[in-house]
Each structure stands twice: as structure tokens, then as C-alpha cells.
């Protein structure tokens, strides 16, 4: 599935805004740039970022109540699904917490969060802050 088809699904079925799509495009640029050096995603999937990574991550919006609370992405890696969900939720009072132990991946995530100006917080260890964020 090509980018235009995925964008149509994201907008029509999952209600991504034009602004969210623009941020996904910026995320794609940053990811491809970083991937040349760090291999965050398999080279064989670079041509299918929109269908394999963005759409797969975005499908979770059907099951999340973005009106309240937060979501934790443990072992965020290149930001899937956490960054995609943070991009989607920019119009809601909802917080995405990304947990990543790799300094290289954290640097990428931090730079991307700041560049895209999205509501996400990055933790350097999967255990930092997670106990406080769990509601039982």
C-alpha cells in the first residue's frame, strides 16, 4: 500500500488531521535520515514506512480513550507505536510516555519529539516513573 492510500485511511477511518499527517511526514524524514546511520528499521521496510510502521501503529487509536490518562510505550525503539500515537493525540488531553534504554534511540526520540512539538515524555529506563504512572 502506497503513502497516498495510507493517508486516506488515516484521515477517513482513523480521523488523523492534516496537521497530524504533516507531522508524520516530518517524522518519516527524520527516521530515514537517522536510519542511514543507526539502522532503526530494516532497510527493506524503508519503502513501506507508511503502511508497515505508521498505519500499523495508528490502528491502536480505535482502542484508546484519548480523552483522559496516558499511555506507556515500553522499549520505544524508533518510536512505534508511541510517537505515532502522540502525533495523533495532539488535540487531546492525553500524554504518551516513551521508555527507551538505548542512548542512541533516546537521542533520536528526544530530537523528534522536540522538532515535531508533540505531547510525549521520554524516560531513560523502562522502570523510571512507570510505577507512579500505573493505576491499579
Q: Where are the model-predicted features located?
A:
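Conserved SAM/SAH cofactor-binding pocket of Class I
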Residues: 58-136
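Class I SAM-dependent transferase core
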Residues: 2-66, 104-105, 111-118
Amino acid at each position: 500500500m502506497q503513502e497516498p492510500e495510507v493517508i486516506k485511511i488515516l484521515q477517513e477511518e482513523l480521523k488523523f488531521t492534516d496537521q497530524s499527517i504533516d507531522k508524520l511526514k516530518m517524522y518519516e524524514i527524520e527516521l530515514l535520515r537517522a536510519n542511514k546511520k543507526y539502522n532503526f528499521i530494516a532497510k527493506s521496510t524503508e519503502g513501506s514506512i507508511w503502511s508497515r510502521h505508521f498505519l500499523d501503529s495508528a490502528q491502536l487509536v480505535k482502542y484508546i480513550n484519548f480523552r483522559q490518562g496516558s499511555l506507556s510505550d515500553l522499549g520505544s525503539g524508533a518510536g512505534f507505536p508511541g510517537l505515532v500515537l502522540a502525533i495523533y493525540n495532539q488535540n487531546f488531553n492525553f500524554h504518551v510516555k516513551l521508555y527507551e534504554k538505548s542512548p542512541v534511540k533516546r537521542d533520536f526520540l528526544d530530537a523528534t519529539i522536540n522538532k515535531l512539538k508533540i505531547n510525549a515524555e521520554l524516560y531513560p529506563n523502562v522502570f523510571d516513573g512507570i510505577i507512579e504512572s500505573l493505576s491499579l
